[in-house]
Amino acid sequence: MNQVNAAIAAGTWPVPPVSLFSWGSNNAGQLGLGNTTYYSSPKQIGAASAWLTIAAGYAFVVSTKLDGTLWSWGANGSGQLGIGSTADKSSPNQVGALTAWLKVSAGYAHTLATKTDGTLWSWGWNAYGQLGIGSTVSKSSPNQVGALTTWSAIAAVDRHSLAVKTDGTLWSWGRNHTGQLGLGNTTYYSSPKQVGALTAWLSVAGGRYFSLAIKTDGTLWSWGGNQYGRLGLGNTTGYSSPKQVGALTNWATSSGGIFHTLATKTDGTAWAWGNGTYGSLGQNNTTYYSSPKQVGALTTWLSVTAGGYASSIAIKTDGTLWGWGNNPQGVLGRGNLTDYSSPVQLGALTSWTKAQTGHTFTVAIKT
């Protein structure tokens, strides 16, 4: 147990009240509200607690608390909730009894997580080896990926996985039919394989059949399937090894959906590219773009998340929550089912800190 977790357990750490909200589709209980009713505006999940991180998969959610515990809910047909069964859960269930979980990431139906000791764990669907455990057998409880204690950044991306180690090396495994593993081929791998020899990778992300990564120098890279230009390279050609997106060196975050990509720069601007159907790129149109286009002129964007079904959610530095694009079952949280082709604010609150969008639902943390 680290010092923060120990202080929390002892009651000496000042834990602020943090609330978790959800909205959108709820067929598998992915909203965590104890039912399967969809809601087009935010609904609070239980009482305020010490929620820390959230990760939204296709129809499930995994979340950590400040005390290091791990929780999950929603679809569980492949064991992606990690609770030792395959039954869907419509309210948060604790994953084991450990209090050392640090980071989580959710793919289509598999989950990756790191612990405070730097170990990497996985569970859920494993048909393509996306769990990285050397087999294609699905697991309903956490299994350690190798024996290393140096994992830093992770991304469970649809049907493949990406990770960065503390030495800056990049690793990938799982499905690879479009070259999304970045290994220069289309071979599937059920255990981690290093992507090139560079040691300057910082963060990873991606969408359906493609990958994104940012280096320590602020450059953005992409590879894999490139339908609709979602790689941002100015074309629709697929690549099986990393390609730099433009020449800029100030990218901060990135997020991939099924056919579109979002990113922020260190100057607070937000950018989008790929399939613009339903207005998912925030350009006030439904045009496709194969290279980055700025979303408006604001320089106050903090984070962006590209939803699976052409929706987009973003948080500004003032804590306001915004959305645009496709709005099936109210994934944009506006209380309606209307699509929007440019950013619109979700309510008037100014205390949102994190947001994640699954296929057609959203989960967010508010202080």
What are these regions (language model features)?
Residues M1-W23, K366-T367:
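Enriched but not universal
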Residues S22, F60-S63, S72, H110-A113, ...:
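Conserved core positions of repeat-based scaffolds
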